[in-house]
């Protein structure tokens, strides 16, 4: 279970949220068997999605982040509900790359830079909001910052990090997002820049035992902060046999007829690796169900 906190400055000029997502990213690594660099990429995206999801107002709202820079990891995707509960995957869960020139895991090399970050917000309207920006670095935090500046016109500071142990378990993972509110002027921007000019990486702060609340106060020492809310997000998949059945029906009757010829049809959830098995009799029932819908 993760820990997430959201704060607002007393002067009403900015918000800051921070999260410890170590348990969440560990769970993702267990499910997908990710290599170190893919754990770092997926973990950063899961953390960003959790933070962004927690800021959604509607109980049933959700946000999905998808990044594909034509790197060896392929598409990396993370989705969050409005409580910050997340799930995600990378198309290629095992990628081995040398460390980058800073001696760190080469997330940019795994993700690639030739592509887009897509943000899909389902706010319960007729159509979801979709924003898309070109990848800036493939390091993910910079790409999230660029998304907010370009698509939502919100000045943002985003920091994300994942520390991977030699045995591929996750030592620490987390991040923070600072966002200026419309009341902020140039002096506030200067104040924020001064605050963050010499801070430790977020994983270093977590490794020192700092809580998300302490991280918020550490990165913005010049601001008095009021806590908005706290939550304990987790890695949570919402797949079910009913959802998988609906997905199979949506393929159309012709495809279902083909599946009926197989001894069994196995569908595996990309997010949690749970397997759903459908026998020819199950497919028959789905065909009947789809016929009933067509007759209405």
Language-model features, listed with the residues they occupy:
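Interaction interfaces in information-processing and related assembly proteins
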Residues: 1-229
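Cys/His-clustered metal-coordination modules, chiefly Zn-binding fingers
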Residues: 197, 201-296
């Amino acid at each position: 279970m993760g820990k997430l906190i959201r704060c607002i400055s007393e002067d009403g000029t900015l918000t800051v949220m921070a999260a410890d997502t170590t348990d969440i990213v560990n769970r993702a690594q267990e499910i997908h068997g990710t290599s170190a660099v893919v754990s770092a990429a997926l973990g950063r995206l899961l953390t960003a999605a959790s933070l962004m999801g927690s800021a959604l107002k509607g109980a049933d709202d959700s946000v999905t982040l998808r990044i594909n820079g034509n790197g060896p990891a392929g598409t990396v995707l993370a989705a969050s509900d409005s409580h910050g509960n997340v799930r995600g995957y990378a198309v290629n869960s095992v990628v081995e790359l040398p460390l980058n020139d800073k001696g760190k895991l080469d997330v940019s090399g795994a993700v690639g830079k030739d592509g887009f970050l897509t943000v899909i917000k389902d706010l319960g309207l007729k159509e979801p909001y979709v924003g898309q920006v070109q990848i800036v670095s493939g390091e993910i935090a910079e790409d999230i910052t660029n998304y907010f500046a370009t698509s939502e016109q919100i000045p943002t500071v985003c920091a994300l990090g994942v520390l991977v142990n030699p045995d591929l378990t996750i030592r620490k993972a987390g991040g923070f997002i600072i966002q200026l509110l419309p009341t902020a002027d140039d002096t506030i921007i200067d104040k924020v820049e001064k605050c963050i000019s010499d801070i430790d990486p977020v994983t270093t702060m977590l490794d020192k035992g700092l809580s998300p609340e302490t991280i918020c106060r550490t990165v913005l020492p010049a601001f008095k902060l009021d806590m908005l809310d706290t939550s304990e997000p987790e890695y949570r998949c919402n797949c079910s046999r009913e959802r998988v059945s609906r997905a199979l029906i949506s393929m159309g009757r012709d495809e279902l007829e083909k599946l009926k010829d197989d001894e069994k049809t196995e569908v595996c959830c990309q997010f949690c690796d749970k397997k759903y098995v459908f026998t020819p009799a199950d497919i028959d029932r789905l065909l009947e169900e789809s016929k009933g819908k067509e007759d209405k």
